Amino acid sequence: MVKAGCRYAVMEVSSQGIKQHRIDGIWFEIAVFTNFGEDHIGPGEHASLGEYRYYKSCLFEQCRIGIGNLDDAQCSYMFQRKCCTKYGFTCREEEGQERGFRNSHVLTAEKISFLMEGGELKTVFYADDRKYELALPGKFNVYNALAALQTMSCLGFEREEAGDVLKHLVVRGRMER
């Protein structure tokens, strides 16, 4: 990838991968916590929610910057004992202050609306006094967009640049037009 000129790589790291030591020795620039659910509990995965939560949180010991969904109750746990710089995102203004994040490190989505225009669904929200549009409907896509915006900002990209990308983003096989 480096020989091909790639400067950034985005990858998913599973809690099972962490448990099985598949990322030992890898240092990440940024790690993102999007959500916590019960879908990884069972044979071959995690024995309990506590185990799942523990392994999911270990990723934040191997990164310089941690970005978290402040609307998820497990976000505080993810950043306990961790030495990375914390950034957050939320759809509720008060969450950043309640979870111990400095306001300058929290990106808040406001005035979220789901629209139908020309037979197509889209999502509009405001953050940092900017309007963002997504061709993808659903609040979970707002959370994913906030995570992407925070990540790109931490990498030095301008929010305007990131907003242009989000406006035209299509995920093949998911909610395609």
Regions found by a protein language model. Name each.
Residues 1, 20-23, 56-57:
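A generic local secondary-structure boundary/capping motif
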Residues 17-20, 74-76:
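Short, well-ordered alpha-helical microsegments
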Residues 3-4, 32-177:
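Acidic, Mg2+-coordinating active-site environments of NTP-dependent enzymes
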Residues 6-18:
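Switch II (G3) loop of P-loop NTPases
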Residues 18-30:
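ATP-dependent NMP and nucleoside kinases share a basic, alpha-helical "lid"
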